[in-house]
A protein has these predicted regions:
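PLP-dependent aminotransferase-like
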Residues: 108-168
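Conserved beta-loop-alpha segment that forms the PLP phosphate-binding cup at the N-terminus of a helix
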Residues: 84-107, 123
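Conserved C-terminal alpha-helix-loop-beta "cap" of PLP-dependent enzymes
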Residues: 294-469
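Conserved N-terminal alpha-helix of the aminotransferase class I/II PLP-enzyme fold
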Residues: 49-91
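N-terminal "arm"/small-domain region of PLP-dependent enzymes with the aminotransferase-like
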Residues: 1-67
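Active-site phosphate-binding strand-loop segment of PLP-dependent enzymes
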Residues: 143-203
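Active-site PLP attachment segment
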Residues: 212-251, 258-269
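Structural signature of PLP-dependent enzymes
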Residues: 273-296, 372
Length: 485
């Protein structure tokens, strides 16, 4: 890494030069530096709305960068150990979909874990690729799906030698990591590309004693959520490329769906955050890992909770663990994760990342403080004392392996009918059903509905999970394929 170059933030510096010129705007956006919308200026501040500007020669253009954005991309690539990098303003959803669209066309097969984010399956709807799912092992105690085992991936490769790519979560939402280096080696030996979904892995590029990053493992592409653990603004992300990819071809794919009016607030936040991580990331994430480990130890002293970590590593389905993730099993207190999630927010003014049926996740990152950790630990102890109940009759599984009957694209565009949820068993789903977060589909278009899946959906709904993907906001009806396939 070139530390001298990494001290620069070319987009931010260009914005500052532009701001000082006091240019009179006769272009968009129409709020004209906030003057046309005083309430917006009051909410965000005059400097913020003053930097919400349009693409122009001094500020470059994200769709075809030739100056400051191009330089910012080069600095990202240098900092992350990539050959090329793209700044993304459509979130990591856009980055994941661009990865898949760059390597898959209609009819191509892609090997991926079923516990992928909905953005990956949405990409299959867009391009018509065929998923070859690897159903990961499930930890029976925690009710969470683990990582893809090398043997599972190798079996899928052997059975589908015509597959063009393998997608790997690195890490999962819960912090679970697969043996990415070995998967890359075996995929490349078969001529397959490897895509790393690192929506929750920005820190892997800078922290010490953390799981291997996608680029370091030799993956061909990696989608990285800078806004999650890297400090940039929500919706800003990165797409990293290794030498095997044609960068300009990938840019063409990105430009199919990415906005032509990129936000300079998002772009400059990526620029500044990259500089911060390049110069101070190792120290910052060492502190993050220390806070997360301290929280784990304190929470496990309470009783009724299990804050898991490196103890899950088994060399196969849990090859490594991201110690910055504070994932906590809650059923020992007779409380679903979503119930603890709601209690923390409503009774203790603590907002955590998500709660599902069995677990909660508190996202620890560069903006956290030890006093905040202490407050979380205290609240969890209070909840254990005041709200603990019998866990009899509670579901304990987060993941049900579905049967794929039709491709996501085929099912998504097929003629459908709406049926009461209880009457859909044996039918083929025509839409997504998921708890969000984490956004991993319980059902995806083209998958068979089973009694177990219906019971899980209704249980999650009744426990208060935020359900998404369905046309029916009440989660009482499901769109299924009319007359089968």
């Amino acid at each position: 890494m070139d530390y001298e170059r990494q001290q620069h933030a070319p987009i931010y510096e260009a914005l500052e030069r532009f701001r000082k010129k006091r240019v009179v705007p006769f272009d968009v956006p129409g709020h004209k530096r906030g003057r046309g919308n005083p309430e917006l200026a009051q909410l965000l501040g005059e400097k913020c709305v003053g930097l919400d500007v349009n693409s122009m020669k001094p500020l470059d253009n994200l769709c075809h960068p030739v100056s400051v954005i191009r330089e910012a991309e080069e600095l990202v690539a240098d900092a992350f150990g990539a050959v090329h990098a793209f700044l993304m303003v459509g979130g990591t959803t856009s980055a994941v979909q661009s990865m898949i669209l760059s390597v898959c066309k209609a009819g191509d097969k892609i090997i991926l874990p079923r516990n992928v984010h909905k953005s990956a399956i949405n990409a299959l709807v867009l391009c018509g690729a065929i998923p070859v799912y690897v159903n990961p092992e499930v930890n029976a105690q925690l009710g969470i799906s683990l990582g893809m085992e090398v043997s599972q991936v190798e079996k899928a490769m052997d059975e589908n030698p015509d597959a063009v790519a393998v997608l790997v979560n690195n890490p999962t939402y819960y912090g679970i990591c697969s043996d990415l280096r070995t998967i890359v080696k075996k995929a490349h030996a078969r001529g397959m590309k490897v895509l790393a979904d690192e929506a929750h892995g920005t820190h892997l590029y800078f922290g010490r004693n953390l799981p291997v990053s996608g680029m370091a493992a030799g993956a061909d592409m990696a989608a990285v959520s800078m806004h999650k653990s890297g400090g940039s603004l929500t919706q800003s992300s990165l797409l990293l490329l290794n030498k095997s990819m044609n960068a300009e071809k990938v840019r063409q794919i990105i430009n199919l769906t990415q906005t032509t009016s990129a936000s300079y607030l998002l772009l400059s936040s990526l620029d500044i955050s990259r500089r911060n991580l390049a110069l101070r990331g190792e120290e910052s994430f060492e502190k993050v890992a220390g806070m997360a480990q301290y929280a784990r130890e304190e929470i496990n002293e309470i009783g009724g909770y299990y804050a898991y970590g490196m103890d899950l590593i088994n060399g196969t389905s849990v090859f490594d663990f991201d110690v910055t993730k504070l994932s906590i099993y809650t059923l020992g207190n007779g409380l679903a994760g979503i119930e603890v999630y709601d209690l923390l927010r409503d009774e203790y003014d603590i907002q955590i990342e998500f709660g599902d049926i069995c677990n909660i996740l508190a996202y620890i990152s560069i903006g956290d403080r030890l006093q905040d950790i202490e407050r979380l630990v205290g609240a969890l102890a209070d909840i254990e004392r005041l709200y603990k109940k019998d866990s009899t009759g509670m579901l304990s599984g987060e993941y049900i392996a579905p049967a794929v009957v039709a491709s996501p694209q085929q099912a998504f565009y097929a003629e459908k009918e709406s049926l009461p949820m209880e009457q859909t068993v044996g039918r083929i789903s025509g839409e997504f059903v998921m708890c969000y977060p984490p956004g991993i589909p319980i059902l995806a278009p083209g998958e068979m509905v089973t009694q177990e899946i219906v019971e899980y959906i209704l249980y999650a709904r009744d426990k208060g999970c935020s359900m998404q993907g369905m046309e029916d906001p009440k989660v009482e009806h499901l769109q299924v394929l009319k007359g089968g396939i």
